[in-house]
Amino acid sequence: MSTTSFAWVALTLAGVIAVTAATTAQAQEAVAGSAEAGAQKVGVCLACHGPNGNSVNPEWPSLAGQNAHYVREQLRLFRAAHRSNVVMAAQATALTDQDIADVAAYYATQTPAGLEADPSYWKAGEALYRGGDRERNIPSCKACHGPVGLGNPAAGYPALRAQHAVYTIGQLKQYAADARYVDAAGVQQKSRNGHMMTTISKRLSEEDMRNLGSYIQGLR
């Protein structure tokens, strides 16, 4: 398969999934979110996710600028125990649909803090993020997450820009180990884009993950 054909297939696949995901997302957005109301509800979130959604601990994700569709979906998964995390499960259980909508709307309006990419790794990360690897059937990350990591809000693809490299690497490893979307008993659960990310992550080496994590951290 030529490079052009490979890119076309990757983009076509992303487009088909985006249409399906967008339809699902629209059905889930029946409750309108208020960023102003969300600002009054994120007090407990600050301890881990930082002021204005910019985490200071690289183990915990920054949420500033994350698209609301994605935050809603993840909070619902935590609430339903379809994504296992002791801290998040406890917090999400108490949230109503309105709370989730408001919190998601708030974080979507916040500005990501600028982080720097590790100069030792970001070049290789850029090549994989933007061009993929045809020989290993790894599509470019930008096909779904955009050239500067803004994601695709309508399709539910998350923004990646300025995310901590440590967190990104950890999530890629979870996908590769079939551990990203599991319940407390370790049973695999469904998610909108989980299967695609699991398939791709299994093709990544630890070096690939490190390079991608560094490049993504430096995206603006």
Which functions belong to the PLM regions below?
Residues M1-T12:
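Bacterial N-terminal signal peptides that target proteins for export
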Residues A35, G53-R83, A89-A94, K142, ...:
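Gly/Gly-Pro-rich "capping" loops immediately C-terminal to redox-active cysteine motifs
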Residues A10-T20:
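Bacterial N-terminal signal peptides
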Residues A155-R220:
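Structured core of small recognition/catalytic domains
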Residues G38, C45-N52, V103, I138-G149, ...:
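The canonical Cys-X-X-Cys-His
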Residues T23-V42, V56-E59, T109-E135:
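Electrostatic cytochrome c docking/interface patches
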